[in-house]
């Protein structure tokens, strides 16, 4: 998509797609794509939306932070009026807040990240669940049907599963390899992250890759037990030597598989499949569609005519206290 609507509008892009499936990577409140209304692509039946994490969750410093971030990421020159105006046009508190709500409603089904180009790749899990905490505080718990309930609902299972799907099975479905990864099922790779409950979303205890310990907490090698401090996160058996390639796969097009074994890697080749003809309706626990509108003057976002408003938060879950 044009990063600032310099070529096409949202409506132009949807006409070009003509109902074909697309994974739109920047359906979000501030990042790339059509300015100022890229969120209109959320909820469209053939558009699988995901958003990167710089504004997740919407915090008090997001508006101030993003001017410098956009200028740096896109190599803009703030002394040029056009560049400065383009950066300012992308910073909209109303759409930043609405992005959180669209995630909580299951309209945006995937969380993701750039790296060094507006996104913090190492924080996607933490920010996803910090957003879940912010939304519970604002909107209350979800009931067993994924709608808003009351405190009598008793647990956070529905919201946890909705947000977990944004990180795991839904990206796998969108990219065509849900038959290999994305959930814990017989026949799939045993790619599993294990957490102590008190550190869930912040610090993993062990990362299993195809069942092998590849990354995790290790104690002092001179210690008499495995819990003697200092405990540090680091690579384990599955990350060393040829093991990393042996327990990994290379996802390729079906045509590449049919063309024979020509890729110079020892990784097992797996063909992607099922990426055409899918849409938001195929996203687990995040399948809501509807008409999203962004007011061109105020930036107010609505879904099927209902305003979506979320205030910037002063504090978030899984923040600095976990990393002292």
Predicted segment positions?
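Active-site neighborhoods of metal-dependent hydrolases
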Residues: 2-164, 199-200
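Active-site microenvironment of metallo-dependent hydrolases
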Residues: 92-109, 115-324
